[in-house]
Amino acid sequence: MKKLSPSLKIYILLVLVLALSNAFQAYFQVYQSFMPPAELPAPPLVLALANAGIAIFLYGGLGYIGLKLSGRLGFAAIWESDVTNRQRFVVPALIGAICGVFLIISDLIFSPFNSIGRFVHPLFPSSILASVSAGIGEEIIFRLFFIPFWVWLISIILRGRRQNQVFWIISKISALAFALGHLPSLMILYGFKSVGDISPVLIIEIILLNGIISMLAAYYMRKFGFLAAAGIHFWTDIVWHVIWGIAQVIL
């Protein structure tokens, strides 16, 4: 039997952490701390198992495909031997913290004009689990799977030419998809009936803030591996959702 690589072992661990985090949030309904109350479609245990299954099979499966394709494209592996722990953990944490501060400042600037005021955040400590799930799950879908898949597919069509340009184009599309992917939850949270009800200023804010984080995550994933991308996202959310969320409650 072929021995699992360190990168694959870490990936499996990340998927299991995602599954546990999602299951815990579903079982204890932590999202109701900041979302409008709604009747559960199934018992909490069923929801927890369903969320864990989605994380393992859907997220895990798509991420595994992306993991294999990223290796073919020359992206850094999750546990690339040439990547230092400083590049893999420390620098992404610092970048994430800076991005979190940037989101806070932007929130204060945009809030008088975006029609909803300041963004609401999950209550502590559920905000930590939300940060874990976003840092792993959203990065698996929008970075680890989306970018390598489309770069690989287009590279076949172009026979390997202009791969760097293709990477940046796909990264921008991924960033836009990631930003717009927040609109459905935003509509539920603030009671918008359609996308047309959302203020253009708010849409610009969402695209700008999420887009910057997405582009940084894409670059660091290719250069230093998936852990770097997940780290940027996770530490951004820790500052933005956890620390700023607590500060807003206190202040």
Labelled PLM ranges:
Residues A38-E39, L45-V46, S70-G137, V151-R161:
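Juxtamembrane helix-loop-helix connectors linking adjacent transmembrane helices
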Residues P125-L251:
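Transmembrane helix-loop-helix hairpins at the membrane interface
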